[in-house]
Design a protein with these regions (language model features):
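Generic beta-strand/beta-sheet core signal
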Residues: 55, 180-181, 210, 279
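Charged, elongated alpha-helical/coil segments that serve as electrostatic interaction surfaces
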Residues: 170, 261-269, 278, 294
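Conserved anion-binding
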Residues: 118-155, 159-176, 180, 188, ...
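Generic structural signal for well-ordered alpha-helical scaffold segments
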Residues: 41, 197, 261-265
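Short helix-capping segments at alpha-helix termini
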Residues: 85-86, 198-203, 268-271, 303
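Active-site beta->alpha loop and helix N-cap motifs at the rims of alpha/beta catalytic domains
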Residues: 2-162, 243-257, 273-275, 281-304
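Catalytic-face loop-and-helix region of soluble metabolic enzyme cores
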Residues: 202-272
Length: 304
């Protein structure tokens, strides 16, 4: 059983916004926020996005299809965009492995006081081994900072080998929510069914769905982001991403909506509080938001 009472679930629709490159500065950050408002209005979902989810970006291996340049700090980005997005709160990911305990505590204090309702702790990039990095392990952070951060998140990758045990341990350590990797199959349904049968933890699940524009056919960023060489389940997801990228807009919407329905219908009765995390990996656009609008029309957190 969970030793502590769960915080109230976020029950939210969160939109991922990646901080701009440092060299693009404040104006680009402001334009990102204004684009969210404009695309929300055009797609008819004004007021439906309750949080922005800002990832703490770290340099990964050199195979990344789009070069990783230094990004604006999460906190700096949030302070620029928050006044432009009234009523919207923050979620973020925080890399823990390169900060010692006092430095991480200071960072989390600043994030919490700035309006971040949930912080997901993430580890080293995949070019490094778990345990590398001189700082705090993400699983330790889940318990160390339970008095400081109410909603403490962990990344959940349902197709990853050994993920049942890994996610159970994260919940035991104090994770109150799991944020999934981008979902391009309904593997999360069987994962959560098995998880619910095996233990009594019922963390909130942020189900992540990403729009796939035509550009993916040429660039392959999403294909790279979800990669897990030798994993047939992920290979099938990568094929679905290719299909989405090559599809006409109406077909693309239909395919993504069908996936969304299968996931929502499959996990809705398992007893997990649910939130939705939406991502336009190549940038905010009206076609992405029109797709998100159809998904949210089918089911939205907090809707009767």
């Amino acid at each position: 059983m969970q030793s502590k009472e769960q915080p109230l679930p976020l029950n939210t629709v969160a939109l991922e916004l990646v901080p701009p490159n440092v060299d693009r500065g404040r104006e680009h950050a402001l334009e990102d926020a204004r684009k969210v408002l404009r695309c929300s209005a055009e797609a008819g979902i004004e007021g439906r996005i309750n949080h922005v989810m800002i990832p703490g970006m770290i340099e990964e291996d050199s195979g990344r299809p789009i070069e990783m340049k230094p990004k604006m700090d999460v906190l700096d980005f949030w302070r620029i965009i928050a006044p432009e997005l009234p009523g919207v709160r923050g979620l973020c990911t925080q890399v823990t492995a390169f900060l010692d305990e006092p430095a991480l505590r200071q960072r989390l204090t600043e994030l919490s006081s700035a309006g971040f309702d949930g912080i997901a702790f993430v580890g080293v990039p995949r070019t490094m081994n778990d345990g590398e990095g001189s700082g705090v392990a993400p699983t330790d952070a889940l318990s160390l900072y339970d008095g400081l951060v109410d909603n403490r998140g962990a990344i959940l990758i349902p197709t990853r080998d050994g993920e049942q045990g890994r996610f159970t341990f994260k919940c035991k350590q104090g994770a109150t929510y799991g944020m999934t990797q981008l979902l391009y199959s309904d593997a999360i349904v069987d994962f959560l069914k098995e998880f619910a049968t095996a233990n009594e933890y019922r963390p909130e699940i942020l189900l992540s769905f990403g729009f796939v524009p035509k550009m993916e056919s040429r660039v392959g960023l999403i294909h790279w982001l979800i990669q897990d060489p030798g994993n047939p389940a992920v290979a099938a997801e990568q094929e679905f991403v290719k299909t989405l990228a090559a599809s006409e807009p109406a077909d693309k919407r239909r395919l993504l909506l069908d996936l969304y329905k299968r996931v929502i219908d499959g996990v809705g009765e398992l007893g997990f509080p649910l939130s939705i995390h939406l991502e336009a990996t190549y940038g905010v656009s009206t076609p992405a938001f029109e797709t998100f609008a159809e998904m949210l029309d089918y089911w939205s957190p907090g809707a009767p």
